[in-house]
C-alpha cells in the first residue's frame, strides 16, 4: 500500500511538473575552448595572490622577504571535464609559478638587500565548480571545492651574502611554500563565487525583447551533469510586458537533446513560439490599418469596383471618402514544427470601410482571412532570428457561400498586399531576433538547424568574442571583500 501511494505521489508530481520551452546542452566538445579561456583567466587571478612577508632571526642574523608577487604561471598538464558530483572539475598538475620578491638581511651592522626571482615547482590544483539555480531562476556557481599544493620552492641567491642566504634558505622556502599553499584556494574560491557569478549575471533571465513583450529564461531545475554533457532546462516563455504575471500553459511536446558532436545544442518547442505569438496578440500588435493613400491604388480601385453597388447608394459626402482596410488577428497564431519544416497558421478578419472625415465609418465588407506562413530559423551570434514567407492564403465570408464566391477576385490583390506591405513589417520585427541565454562575450558559430516532430534543435560551436577578463571586469561587483575567504575545507595546506 505504501509503495502504491508513493507511486501515485510521484505520478502526481510529474503531471504538475512544468515542461521546458527551451533546453541547452553543453557538450564535452566545448571544454577545450572553455579550458583555454579559463586557464588564461586563472593565470591572471593567480597573479593577484598576496603573500605576507616572511621574516625571522637566528642568532644575530635577521632576514625579511617582502613584496612577494606572482609573475607567471607555467602549465604542464591540465584537464577540464564534467563530473556528476562536482559539475565542472579542473585538474592542474606539475605546474610552476614564477615569483618576484624583495630580500633583506642584517648581520650585526652588515646589511644586504635587493630583489630576486624564485619559482614554485610541482604546483597541483584540483578545483570543482558546482552549478545550481538561485531563487530567481538564474544559473549560479553555488560552491567551489579546492585542493592545492606546492611541492618545492627554488631560489637562487647571489651577492656577498649568498652563503648566508643559502644557510637560511630552508626556513625561507618552507615558510613561503606554506603561505603560498594557503593563498591559492581563497583566490580560486573568490574567482568562482564572485567573478564567475558576475559573468553568469549577464545571462538573461526575465528581460524585454522590445517595447511590447519580454522573455522568461528561468531555469526550471538545477543543471544536470553527466560524464559528457551539461544539460539545462529553461522556461522559454514570452509574456506581454503590460501583464507581467501572465502565463500560458505549456502543452507542447518536450524538446529532446540527444546529439553531442557540436559544442552546444539548443532546442525550442512549439510552445516557445506559440507563447511569443500569444504575447504579441495579447499586446494588440497583430493588427494593421491602412487608410487613404496607404492603400495601394490598384487595390483601392478594385475594392471600389467590387463594392460599387453598395457605395453608389451612399450619401455623396461619403462616396469619395478615403478607403480604410483593417487586418486584425482574431486568435493567436499557432506554430507547427515537423521534420519537413516549420509553419505558422493565422486567422484574421479583414474589414473594409469608407472613412469620411468627422463622420462615422461606413462598413462595406468584413471577411475572414486564413494564412499559412513558412518560418525559417537561423541563429546569428546569440540571437535567434526568424524569416517568414507567405505560402497559403484564402479569404471567405462567414455570412454566406455566395458572398465568398464574390470575394474570389480580391484574393490575388490582397495576397499581393500581404506580401508587399505586411510581410516586410513582420520580418523586420522577427529578424531582430531574441537573445539565447548565453553569457556576454560568447557567441554561436557554424550553426545547423534541424527540425523534429514538435521541436527544433540548433547545433553550433562557441566563440569567445570577448575574453573572460574583459567581461568580468565590466560586470565586477563593487564590494566583494566578504567573498575572498573560502570555507575552511576549501584550502589545502
UniProtKB/Swiss-Prot annotation:
Q: Tell me what reaction this enzyme catalyses.
A: a 1,2-diacyl-sn-glycero-3-phosphocholine(in) = a 1,2-diacyl-sn-glycero-3-phosphocholine(out); a 1,2-diacyl-sn-glycero-3-phosphoethanolamine(in) = a 1,2-diacyl-sn-glycero-3-phosphoethanolamine(out); a 1,2-diacyl-sn-glycerol(in) = a 1,2-diacyl-sn-glycerol(out); a 1,2-diacyl-sn-glycero-3-phosphate(in) = a 1,2-diacyl-sn-glycero-3-phosphate(out)
What is the tissue specificity?
Answer: Highest level expression in the lung, brain and heart with relatively low levels in the liver, skeletal muscle and testis and very low levels found in the spleen and kidney.
Q: Name one GO cellular component term.
A: extracellular region
Q: Which UniProt keywords apply?
A: Disulfide bond, Glycoprotein, Lipid transport, Nucleus, Secreted, Signal, Transport
UniProt name for this protein: Phospholipid transfer protein
| PTM comment text | Glycosylation is necessary for secretion and its phospholipid transfer activity.
Query: In which compartments does the protein localize?
Result: Secreted; Nucleus
Result of knocking out the encoding gene: Mice show a complete loss of phosphatidylcholine, phosphatidylethanolamine, phosphatidylinositol and sphingomyelin transfer activities, and a partial loss of free cholesterol transfer activity. Transfer of VLDL phospholipid into HDL is abolished. A marked reduction in the levels of plasma HDL phospholipid, cholesteryl ester and free cholesterol seen, whereas the levels of non-HDL lipids are not significantly altered.
Stated role? Mediates the transfer of phospholipids and free cholesterol from triglyceride-rich lipoproteins (low density lipoproteins or LDL and very low density lipoproteins or VLDL) into high-density lipoproteins (HDL) as well as the exchange of phospholipids between triglyceride-rich lipoproteins themselves. Facilitates the transfer of a spectrum of different lipid molecules, including sphingomyelin, phosphatidylcholine, phosphatidylinositol, phosphatidylglycerol, and phosphatidyl ethanolamine. Plays an important role in HDL remodeling which involves modulating the size and composition of HDL.
Intrachain disulfide bonds: 146-185
Q: Which GO terms describe its biological process?
A: ceramide transport; flagellated sperm motility; high-density lipoprotein particle remodeling; positive regulation of cholesterol efflux; vitamin E biosynthetic process
InterPro entries tied to this protein = Bactericidal_perm-incr_a/b_dom, BPI/LBP, BPI/LBP/Plunc, Lipid-bd_serum_glycop_C, Lipid-bd_serum_glycop_CS, Lipid-bd_serum_glycop_N
GO terms for MF: ceramide binding; cerebroside transfer activity; cholesterol transfer activity; diacylglyceride transfer activity; diacylglycerol binding; high-density lipoprotein particle binding; low-density lipoprotein particle binding; phosphatidic acid binding
Q: Which residues cross the membrane?
A: none
Q: Does the keyword Secreted apply?
A: yes
